[in-house]
């Protein structure tokens, strides 16, 4: 059976197709015209939550619309990621999450109800958080080399972690430096701190937001920074790369995502908002106080960076023998 399409129908279809980009642009011009929602996969009051709210407060100012923050902690941020994956792709529901969740969870869980590459469109990456290698304030170790030498000299080493991200960072150090150690899990960093102080733990790689307070009150000391940049509030503490572990780079970066299928003009508008925010002097100052620095990566750059991170962490996680969770 043959089907014939009239010239008039073809012209009509072409006209509709031609107007679609214009319609999307018109929607973006009016966007946002109602409250925005940001989903964060960490508890209210946590370092991640504080980091996110620095951005949402400014987003509210720039967009002219209220921004509602919804904390959905659990499962290494998988709950929050799933919520946004199932949201309407209209730009009004956003996900604030770390690359450690978006890149590592694929290898830390047996199965996920989403694909972090295919099911989301990055808006922008806007901050990077520093971590530090810490020991008790009374420890004899003065440098990372001192600590590494001791760890290599004995088999019964212990490090502490509070989540899967911290576990991966510690294993990254262990693999590159070449020593044996076992993980001791804790519910929170405050729970683990006494065992860092008294030497039960040989070391801990700690979120800089929490660690800075403990360093200031004299409970612990930092031997190294895990990022390729030094933390402004402890400028005399060198990076792991500077101390001989060339290429060591662990500094979770934060980005905003929307569901796949969100119109490109809306993504571009949100990207512009985030770049404005990251360049604000008071945001830079606020981030510095929590061991962070601003990033200004756009949508395409963030997508490429995330893809690279997914590939980077697979061999490290598998070599560590970390059993994927259900």
Q: What is each stretch, according to the model?
A:
Residues 1-5:
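N-terminal secretory signal peptides that target proteins for export/translocation
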Residues 6-11:
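N-terminal export leaders
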Residues 21-25:
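N-terminal signal peptide c-region/cleavage motif recognized by signal peptidases
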Residues 26-118, 155, 165-166, 178-203, ...:
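N-terminal (or domain-start) structured segment
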Residues 33-35, 176, 216, 242, ...:
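An extracytoplasmic/periplasmic, membrane-proximal ligand-sensing/linker region
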Residues 86-92, 107-191, 240, 253-286:
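Hinge/capping helix and adjacent helix->loop/strand transition within the periplasmic-binding protein
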Residues 91-97, 159-160, 202-207, 221-224, ...:
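Paired acidic/hydrophobic, glycine-rich loop segments that form the ligand-binding mouth/hinge
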Residues 115-125, 160, 180-185, 202-203, ...:
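Short beta-strand->loop
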């Amino acid at each position: 059976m043959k089907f014939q399409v009239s010239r008039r129908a073809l012209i009509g279809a072409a006209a509709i197709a031609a107007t679609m980009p214009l319609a999307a642009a018109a929607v973006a011009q009016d966007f946002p015209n109602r409250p925005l929602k940001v989903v964060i996969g960490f508890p209210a009051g946590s370092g991640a939550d504080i980091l996110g709210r620095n951005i949402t407060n400014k987003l509210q100012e720039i967009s002219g619309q209220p921004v509602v923050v919804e904390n959905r902690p659990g499962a290494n941020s998988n709950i929050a990621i799933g919520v946004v994956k199932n949201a309407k792709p209209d730009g009004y529901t956003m996900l604030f999450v770390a690359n450690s969740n978006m890149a590592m969870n694929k290898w830390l869980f047996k199965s996920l109800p989403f694909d972090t590459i295919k099911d989301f469109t990055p808006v922008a990456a806007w901050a990077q958080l520093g971590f530090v290698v810490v020991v008790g304030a009374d420890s004899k170790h003065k440098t990372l080399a001192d600590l590494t030498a001791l760890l290599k000299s004995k088999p019964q080493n212990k490090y502490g972690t509070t989540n899967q991200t911290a576990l991966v960072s510690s294993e990254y150090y262990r693999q590159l430096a070449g020593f044996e150690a076992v993980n001791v899990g804790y519910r929170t960093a405050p729970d683990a701190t006494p065992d860092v102080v008294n030497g039960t733990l040989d070391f801990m790689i700690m979120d800089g937001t929490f660690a800075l307070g403990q360093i200031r009150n004299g409970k612990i000391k930092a031997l190294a920074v895990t990022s390729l940049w030094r933390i402004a509030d402890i400028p005399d503490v060198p990076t792991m790369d500077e101390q001989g572990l060339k290429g060591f780079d662990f500094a979770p970066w934060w980005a905003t995502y929307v569901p796949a299928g969100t119109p490109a003009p809306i993504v571009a508008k949100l990207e512009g908002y985030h770049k404005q925010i990251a360049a604000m002097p008071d945001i830079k100052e606020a981030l510095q106080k929590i061991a962070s620095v601003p990033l200004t990566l756009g949508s395409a750059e963030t997508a490429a960076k995330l893809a690279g991170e997914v590939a980077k962490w697979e061999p490290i996680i598998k070599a560590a023998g970390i059993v994927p969770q259900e």
